[in-house]
C-alpha cells in the first residue's frame, strides 16, 4: 500500500522474488510504475554477468631489488561482479598484503591490484611468496607463486620495449601502472 510522507507525497515499494534458476536464466527484469497508464516510468534491472578474473604476477626487476624493500604484485582483472578475495603467503605462512579498491573497466568488469612489501633480503634468498585469489560468484580459486632466481631474465613478447612485461600500460621506469593510479617503484607506493 502507498504511504504518505511528511511532504504530503505518497511512496510505494514492490519486491519481486525470483528463484535462483530464473535469475540466472533471465538477462533483465523490468518494472513500471506511475499514477496514469499513459505516464508510466520504467526501470530495467540487468542481472550481473559473472566473469572469472585473470591474474598476473608482478615481481621486481633487477633494477628494483637494490633497495631495502621489494614489492610483489598481483594484478587481478576482468572479473564480475566486484567480489574478490586476495591473500598472501610466504612459504605457507599468512602475510599481510594490501588490496586496492576495485575499479570498473569500460567492459563492465573490474580490476584491482594487491601488493606485498617484503625485505629485499628475503626475496634474494629465495623465499617463496604466493598470491591466492578467489572470486566466489564464479567459484574461481587460483594462486600464483613467486620466487627470486639468480640470473633469470624476464622475456618480453616480440616487439615490446624493455620494461613492458607483461604487456600493459608501462614506461621503462615503472613496475606497473594502470588507470588504478598506482605506481610501484623502488619498493614504495607513490
From Swiss-Prot:
One Pfam family this sequence matches: C1-set
Keywords from the named record: Adaptive immunity, Disulfide bond, Glycoprotein, Immunity, Immunoglobulin, Immunoglobulin domain, Secreted
Predominant cellular place of this UniProt entry's protein: secreted
Tissues/organs with expression: Expressed in pancreas, spleen, epigonal organ and at low levels in several other tissues.
Residues carrying sugar: 54, 179
Highest rank taxon of the organism: Eukaryota
Entry GO CC: extracellular region; immunoglobulin complex
Disulfide feature: 74-131
Ig-like C1-type domain sequence ranges: 53-145
Biological processes annotated in GO: adaptive immune response
Signal peptide start and end residues: none
PROSITE patterns: IG_LIKE, IG_MHC
Compartments, as annotated in UniProt: Secreted
Matching PANTHER family: TAPASIN (PTHR23411)
Name by which UniProt lists this protein: Pancreatic IgW, short secretory form
Species of origin: Ginglymostoma cirratum
